[in-house]
A protein has these predicted regions:
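Histidine-/acidic-rich catalytic cores in large beta-rich domains
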Residues: 1-207
Length: 207
């Protein structure tokens, strides 16, 4: 569901060839698989995948993932991986019923040792991940997250067209809900992705 260049990063500068700036990081919503493709050879040189054993276990269970990317150089958390873990249920023998969860989360982690650096979810916000958690933060499909220059994170909870900004402590400091539906007679709406862009990209707007 998502693919992007890694771009310049500290891991490659330190000699780790897996993170060559021209390599491509991808994710698969249907298999909950994160991987990096060597642009020259086509080989998979890094991955996080079911059944989430070894170092991957610290990140499990990841289900229905979207928007996996490396935080660009110059931003807080640069070099870490940021993704939207949608949650829900996933088909296949690699997933047990106990791994299903009706809540979403944003995960930031170090790609070298796969340790979790930051998370935003109903659980981290001290909200029960039951029915209350479902209402609090859950998008079982689409969605994305973006690290901002101020250290906050912009989150697109796409299934309900909710876009909001949270601090590293999880405080919501800005929120927008799109009023636009699929059609005049339908109240449901979705936002596939949402990004913050620099003011200079839209010079006609006032700061």
């Amino acid at each position: 569901n998502c693919a992007s260049w890694l771009g310049p990063n500290k891991w490659y500068d330190a000699g780790d060839e897996r993170f060559h700036p021209e390599n491509i990081i991808c994710d698969s919503r249907n298999t909950s698989h994160l991987f990096i493709i060597d642009h020259k050879t086509g080989n998979i040189v890094w991955q996080v995948a079911p059944p989430f054993v070894g170092a991957d276990a610290a990140l499990a269970p990841i289900t229905g993932v979207h928007g996996t990317h490396m935080i660009p150089r110059g931003l807080p958390g640069e070099g870490n991986i940021l993704l939207f873990d949608n949650g829900g249920t996933m088909p296949g023998d690699l997933y047990a019923d106990s791994q299903a969860h009706a809540w979403s989360r944003i995960i930031e982690f170090n790609p070298v040792d796969k340790t979790r650096v930051w998370e935003y979810s109903a659980a981290t916000m001290k909200v029960s991940p039951g029915q209350h958690g479902y209402k609090f933060f859950f998008s079982p499909y689409i969605s994305i997250a973006q690290r901002l220059p101020n250290g906050n994170t912009l989150i697109d909870e796409g299934a309900c067209s909710r876009i909001f900004e949270v601090t590293p402590m999880g405080e919501i400091v800005w929120e927008y809900r799109s009023p636009y539906g699929y059609a005049p007679a339908m109240k449901a709406n979705t936002t596939y992705r949402a990004y913050a862009v620099p003011y200079e990209w839209v010079p006609q707007l006032k700061k």
